[in-house]
Swiss-Prot record:
The keyword Hydrolase does not apply. This is Cytochrome c biogenesis ATP-binding export protein CcmA. It is a peripheral membrane protein. GO terms for molecular function: ABC-type heme transporter activity; ATP binding; ATP hydrolysis activity. Keywords: ATP-binding, Cell inner membrane, Cell membrane, Cytochrome c-type biogenesis, Membrane, Nucleotide-binding, Translocase, Transport. The gene is ccmA. It holds the Pfam family ABC_tran.
């Protein structure tokens, strides 16, 4: 008798997920999933709820309808942070600390990826030589790169990336795609919102298109 194949559950799954603000629908209901090694590119016009969706998944907003599962198990709002690393529009950095101090501080709060160190993460994102530079002295693009270094150090298997290509030049855009691809090869997954022309999807990418609520 041939034993049935046991497939792993999705790293993230959402069922009947919807969000409203002031009784006005923002998105949903949505059903989608993301497997390990896969990216989901979330597209839609301004106002379609892309940022709101990622903030709901990250637990930054309370959702009144639907279910979110991690590895096949229901995940409450407060339990999802260790599984997810969120990169939003604001870098969330300490302006009066150096780049290296920021990374050490954040690693102390959230841990870090095995075999990765803050100094090497700065080199990966093109900030070698800026270890002692204060964040408030950095350009917008350099701050984005520092936020990407923090993302790279995160041990979380699921990345939630809200417009990660913003404030980056072509080299920076290539860097983001390389990082996402490496994360997927390591068994991670990513949700990426974008409407940019340079958002070349990494391997194993599916699309989720949000429509502006009528």
């Amino acid at each position: 008798m041939i034993e049935p194949l046991h497939t792993a559950p999705p790293l993230l799954a959402a069922h009947d997920l919807a969000f409203s603000r002031n009784e006005e629908p923002v998105f949903g209901p949505l059903d989608f999933h993301v497997d390990a090694g896969e990216a989901l590119l979330v597209q839609g016009d301004n106002g379609a709820g892309k940022t709101t969706l990622l903030r709901v998944l990250a637990g930054l907003l309370h959702v009144e309808r639907g279910q979110i599962q991690i590895d096949g198990k229901s995940a409450k709002r407060g339990d999802r942070s260790r599984f997810m690393a969120y990169l939003g529009h604001l870098p969330g950095l300490k302006a009066d600390l150096s780049t290296l101090e920021n990374l050490h501080f954040l690693c102390g709060l959230h841990g870090r990826r095995a075999k990765q160190m803050p100094g090497s993460a700065l080199a990966i994102v093109g900030l070698a030589g800026y270890e002692d530079a204060l964040v408030r002295q950095l350009s917008a693009g350099q701050r984005k790169r520092l936020a990407l270094a923090r993302l790279w150090l995160s041990p979380a298997p699921l990345w939630l990336l809200d417009e990660p290509y913003a404030n980056l030049d072509l080299d920076g855009i290539t860097l983001v795609n390389r990082m996402i691809s490496a994360h997927l090869r390591g068994g991670g997954a990513a949700l990426v919102t974008t409407h940019g022309a340079y958002a070349a999807p990494p391997v194993r990418t599916r699309m989720l298109t949000l429509e502006v609520a009528a």
